[in-house]
UniProtKB/Swiss-Prot annotation:
Family assignment from sequence similarity: Belongs to the UPF0637 family.
Name recorded for this polypeptide: UPF0637 protein SA0957
Coiled coil residues, start to end: none
Entry-linked Gene3D superfamilies: Protein of unknown function DUF1054 (3.30.930.20)
Record InterPro entries: UPF0637, UPF0637_domain_sf
A Pfam entry, by short name: DUF1054
Source organism superkingdom: Bacteria
Source species: Staphylococcus aureus (strain N315)
Length: 204
């Protein structure tokens, strides 16, 4: 019995039609692991940074018609919420599990906070080849950093700094069939390795 990881069939929760039915599927197949990951990694971030982190599992409470296309657990230093702060995420769409760190368009002092990515531009470019960026957390698209030109990357960061709706995340994503989802041990190792790469951007 696994505690943290997801099986390919768990991702099929996103194929269930209708808001109530899909929420039921998420509650059965995905949210239990998100809560466990929330406990594990809030402790992980607290020990790594010396700041107290809190987990926030997506509730999708505002939805009244459209079923969610993704779900997640986010980690931030506020008990009340994460959207206003730089935060870490573990989440899923039907075809990917993603891990991210960055700043949403709702972030407080977004222009100032996003400048960390400007300052650490070289460090972004030096991330391993399978690392990506996400410029809109609502969409599954996450281009590989290695496929972006310097100008593409600079423009994306500037958009997060200067445009109200702009946001910027560094990310990693794997498919539902990925071998790193086959066991809790492999999955946690993958997540810790990813967050170890993200943490210098948080503490900068």
């Amino acid at each position: 019995m696994t505690k943290y990881t997801f099986k390919p069939k768990d991702f099929k929760a996103f194929n269930v039609e209708g808001l109530d039915a899909r929420m039921e599927a998420l509650n059965e197949y995905i949210r239990p692991q998100l809560h466990e990951l929330g406990e594990y990694f809030s402790d992980f971030f607290t020990s790594q940074t010396g700041e107290t982190f809190y987990p926030h599992v997506a509730k999708h409470a505002r939805r009244s018609v459209n079923a969610p296309k993704d779900t997640w657990v986010a980690f931030a230093t506020s008990k009340r919420g994460y959207k206003m702060l730089p935060h870490f995420q573990i989440g899923m769409f039907e075809d990917q599990l993603f891990v991210m760190f960055g700043i949403m368009h709702e972030a407080k002092d977004k222009a100032t906070r996003a400048k960390v990515f400007e300052r650490k531009f070289k460090a972004i470019q030096q991330l391993p080849d399978d690392y990506r960026v996400c410029l809109d957390h609502m969409k599954p698209d996450k281009p590989f950093i290695k496929d972006l030109t310097d100008d593409d990357l600079k423009e994306a960061i500037q958009r997060a700094i200067n445009v109200k709706k702009g946001e910027f995340f560094i990310a990693r994503a794997i498919t539902p069939q990925d071998k790193r989802l086959k066991s809790d041990k492999a999955f946690i190792a993958f997540l810790e390795e990813t967050f170890d790469q993200f943490l210098p951007f948080y503490s900068a």
